[in-house]
């Protein structure tokens, strides 16, 4: 554990006093050696009053410091009261003022637990923490107090920066959450639209297949109608190719012949005009004479 300069000075002073006591004891044992004059004879009452320390401080010092810390406090006070007061003032100032120590602890707890402070608080804290030590002329104590105040001010500024950064991060988090909710809503709408589009696509595909079947059936019907129309047109141009029309006109040709079913065939009647199916007339129907003549002529 690192010791403060006042403690180091006190230890050096204490070891020096012990060395002087040993030297005095050795001188007393020597023949002709006498005791040394008291060291406080070096300082007069005016010199002691010139120091800026009150008598209450000295009385408080002797009443507060435990005996195990100052084992030879009475002898030291008797031999070097002024030097003792000067050397130990900086180290026991806090112990001499319990109110200042309590205030220091309270301020430290408030600084650690609080969120922020102000410059006026720091100045008032410095004034309160000084207590009886504010009149100290030791530069180490002054530097220590200034360093402590500077550290607390730096910590306060650091806490302010951290709080501002934290507030900024919270604002960004809120914005990102809003954007996330908006994007999630858009994604849900897009999924719904995609599902609807897929359903409509299936319906349209089924409609297209049904229309294709209907178109194919219509094409077949058109092909059949064209074939029947072509056959009908051909039948109107050449009636001889129409079997129905020929079958209907055969009895008309036979009715022009005078033929009895039971009578023997006697030949054809005199030449008559025979109506042909085409509307023409055939004159001079040939008989046996013509037949025989034709055969003979052949």
Swiss-Prot record:
It comes from the Eukaryota. Heterodimer with RISBZ1/BZIP58. InterPro entries: bZIP, bZIP_plant_GBF1, bZIP_sf, RISBZ3/4/5. It holds the Pfam family bZIP_1. The keyword Ubl conjugation does not apply. Residues 143-162 are annotated as: Basic motif. This is bZIP transcription factor RISBZ3. Transmembrane segments: none annotated. Residues 141-204 form the bZIP domain. GO terms for molecular function: DNA binding; DNA-binding transcription factor activity. Residues 169-183 are annotated as: Leucine-zipper. Keywords: DNA-binding, Nucleus, Transcription, Transcription regulation. It is found in: Nucleus. Transcriptional activator that possesses broad binding specificity for DNA promoter elements with the core sequence 5'-ACGT-3'. May be involved in the regulation of genes expressed during seed development. Binds to the DNA specific sequence 5'-TGAGTCA-3' found in seed storage protein gene promoters. Residues 109-119 have a biased composition (Low complexity). GO terms for cellular component: nucleus. The lineage of its organism: Eukaryota, Viridiplantae, Streptophyta, Embryophyta, Tracheophyta. Residues 13-39, 104-138, 268-298 are annotated as: Disordered. Expressed in developing endosperm, especially in aleurone layer cells. It comes from Oryza sativa subsp. japonica. CDD domains: bZIP_plant_GBF1 (cd14702).
